[in-house]
Amino acid sequence: MAATLRELRGRIRSVGSIKKITKAQELIATSRIARAQVRLESARPYAVDITRMLTTLAYEAVLDHPLLVASATPKRAGVLVVSSDRGLCGAYNANVFRRSEELFSLLRAEGKTPILYVVGRKALNYYTFRNWGIAESWTGFSEQPKYENAAKIASTLVDVFMLGSSESDAGVDELHIVFTEFKSMLSQSTKARRMAPMVVEYVEESKLPRTLYSFEPDATTLFEALLPRYLTIRVYAAMLESAASELASRQRAMKSATDNADDLIKALTLEANRERQAQITQEISEIVGGANALANAR
């Protein structure tokens, strides 16, 4: 009985230590999520506007650019998978990998070979363990991505896209990105989006007056100047979405773990008290029994 009581007290101490860790992780995630949301909300308008600008530019100038014209026979598709560097964030990474596998299956069904690019140690470890060939990886900034990180990634993607699969074995015909879209603290969803070639929506002619644009120095030069910025901001916005989603998932997961630790400590404490009560009762019974035996001996 004494051994059982010691075991229960040891388990209570162990759970208490784990609770301190999960509570600390919860507080850290909570403190960082506000800054992540501010950065995300600041970047979203720019991402929307530059996409609208390029779409308008392509529509008005009728450009013939690789970013706009899909390859007649696409062979390879580059896929950028955005994951986290650390765990303890619930099903965040599992959902990203599941959505990535769905995209890979879809690309293969279309006769395209996926070329993998990853952000985050979790994706790097996941695909390395499964013997996937990883073309390029970037780690160490999943929680707090910077524009410079996105620019470096986008530069690599632009280079392989402009090469094309017909010109080089290192080139790709399409660029896709898998990331987690942040909607609220309680809602995030994994998305797979095509970044290149761009999808340009050509609207029907309207009877209403429309804005006329003048492009200087010319539409092609302007488009090529904006192209790196477009892909950079698309990657940066996706990384900010994923960072906010990662922190929200970690905050929820750690809060749930802390609450479960509280419940387990209460249950173990109750069981330990019962064991202690039984031990005291047994000791009292032994004392009373001994006293009665001495009284009868007299």
UniProtKB/Swiss-Prot annotation:
One of its GO terms (biological process) is proton motive force-driven plasma membrane ATP synthesis. Keywords: ATP synthesis, Cell membrane, CF(1), Hydrogen ion transport, Ion transport, Membrane, Transport. GO terms for cellular component: plasma membrane; proton-transporting ATP synthase complex. CDD domains: F1-ATPase_gamma. The keyword Membrane applies. It is a peripheral membrane protein. Coiled coil: none annotated. One of its GO terms (molecular function) is proton-transporting ATP synthase activity, rotational mechanism. It holds the Pfam family ATP-synt. Its main location: membrane. The keyword Ion transport applies. It is found in: Cell membrane. InterPro entries: ATP_synth_F1_ATPase_gsu (IPR035968), ATP_synth_F1_gsu (IPR000131), ATP_synth_F1_gsu_CS (IPR023632). Produces ATP from ADP in the presence of a proton gradient across the membrane. The gamma chain is believed to be important in regulating ATPase activity and the flow of protons through the CF(0) complex. Belongs to the ATPase gamma chain family. F-type ATPases have 2 components, CF(1) - the catalytic core - and CF(0) - the membrane proton channel. CF(1) has five subunits: alpha(3), beta(3), gamma(1), delta(1), epsilon(1). CF(0) has three main subunits: a, b and c. NCBIfam families: ATPsyn_F1gamma, PRK05621.1-2. This is ATP synthase gamma chain. The gene is atpG.
